[in-house]
Amino acid sequence: LPVILFAPSWGDGNALALKGVDIIAALIEEYEIILRPHVMSLIEDSQTLDIIRQRFGSHPRFSLDLSADSAPSIRRADLLISDWSGIAFEYALSFLKPVVFIDGPMKVFNPNWNRYLQEPGIEKSRRKSVGVIVSELTNLRPVINELLSSADVWTTRIMDARHELLFYPSECAAVSHRTLTLLAEHQTGTEWVRV
């Protein structure tokens, strides 16, 4: 049975609050579902989470992951469903597995972002490099089935995206350590250079 991790973001218009119950209901009979809500959703979307617990809490193919450690759920998942959460790219680029993005309002914490950037960033511009955007929930299961059945194609596609988006993908920890060491050695004054 394929394992689907549903890890939405939080804030206005997030997929959990708007469509969470419907998403789980549409998938629970065909897949194992792990819901991993954002920690802020425990406060902001507590009513939705209560409804989900009541409706699906005892279902053998449903689990609610509230652990501080996301790694076990991420590793188990064959596919991730999210909205505008950064976990989507972390998952896809780390595990070379596809993401289904539930279409909804873009998460914007700085409404003046376009004053400083020419493009909205990878969370908007590169979504189709690592997955498929779903606007209508009636398309959700067919899209998931297509992504799972074409996993090899998506692995290659996401690998290409990873090479375009990440610097030193297999050596990033060592390179980051060297960079921070150089910054520390050349630090002047008492403030760190903000990068």
Task: Tell what function each PLM region has.
Residues L1-I52, V132-V134, L148-D152, F167-Y168, ...:
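Conserved catalytic-core segment of nucleotide-activated headgroup transferases in glycan assembly
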Residues S9-G13, V39-L42, S70, G86-I87, ...:
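Short, solvent-exposed loop/turn segments at secondary-structure junctions
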Residues A15-L18, D45-T48, A77, F89-S94, ...:
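A short acidic (Asp/Glu
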Residues A26, D50-S58, P120-K128:
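Short, conserved catalytic or adaptor-binding loops enriched in Gly and charged residues
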Residues I34, S63, L79-I81, V100, ...:
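Hydrophobic/aromatic beta-strand patches that form the interior of the parallel beta-sheet core
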Residues Q47-F89:
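Donor nucleotide-activated moiety binding/catalytic core segment of transferases
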Residues W84-L165:
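Catalytic binding pocket for nucleotide-activated donors in carbohydrate/polymer assembly enzymes
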Residues L137, R141, S170-T181:
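Short, amphipathic alpha-helical "lid/cap" segments that border enzyme active or binding sites
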